[in-house]
């Protein structure tokens, strides 16, 4: 840690002072891995809001649109690799300073970097779940199933959007075929928490339990505009433990922070490598 840039000395000191950090990460942690984020530096949406849970479950055309875009977007998302921010946080854990990492991301890049204690708050995009029988299938296998059913779509390309989505604009999705669950015929959905869907209670309870044992909180790459993540910062503030954030631009918790570093995640955390 002694070779860190002078500008990040305050963050180094914060990490050095605490033994049981609870780390909360967001989309900004993965942008350098080629995965776009949702919001700009002011916390506003860069694109239209992501698909809504109720619409996905009730509207066939919404499911067609989602899976058509995902068929294109998964090709690059599934190849994403951890960047220096992920590796730095894994090193923090290896050094015994991180009690738990709670990520709002669904890309599993923390695990790929070797981080062991990780809670996927919003689920994981590498699995597909049947909403009927609960059966789970690897997303890579479902990609093959989608491709076989929609071979004519495989030649399409589009710019990447967050979380394995692709900006397929002005496409006619009416011909896109969405396979049903082979076991029960149920609706297949990525094993992630959509907007309008609740985070499972046991996941929240487990995260809160780990937070109760922490002596400080470190936020990395999140504007905290979504309440599912922000509530943990509120809980930390209520416990009166120090809270530091690394994020470009404003966060919903700016008035609760002990320290804020407005720098790219991988640069701010470089002293951990």
Curated annotation (Swiss-Prot):
Zn(2+) binds at residues 130, 133, 181, 184. It catalyses: N(6)-acetyl-L-lysyl-[protein] + NAD(+) + H2O = 2''-O-acetyl-ADP-D-ribose + nicotinamide + L-lysyl-[protein]. SUPFAM superfamilies: DHS-like NAD/FAD-binding domain. GO terms for molecular function: histone deacetylase activity, NAD-dependent; NAD+ binding; zinc ion binding. InterPro entries: DHS-like_NAD/FAD-binding_dom, NAD-dep_sirtuin_deacylases, Sirtuin, Sirtuin_cat_small_dom_sf, Sirtuin_class_II, Ssirtuin_cat_dom. Keywords: Cytoplasm, Metal-binding, NAD, Transferase, Zinc. It is an enzyme of class 2 (transferase). NAD(+) binds at residues 26-46, 104-107, 221-223, 247-249, 265. Pfam families: SIR2 (PF02146). It is found in: Cytoplasm. Binds 1 zinc ion per subunit. It comes from the Bacteria. Its EC number is 2.3.1.286. Residues 1-273 form the Deacetylase sirtuin-type domain. The keyword Zinc applies. GO terms for cellular component: cytoplasm. The keyword Cytoplasm applies. The active site is at 122 (proton acceptor). Its cofactor is Zn(2+). NCBIfam families: PRK05333.1. NAD-dependent protein deacetylase which modulates the activities of several enzymes which are inactive in their acetylated form. Belongs to the sirtuin family. Class II subfamily. This is NAD-dependent protein deacetylase 2.
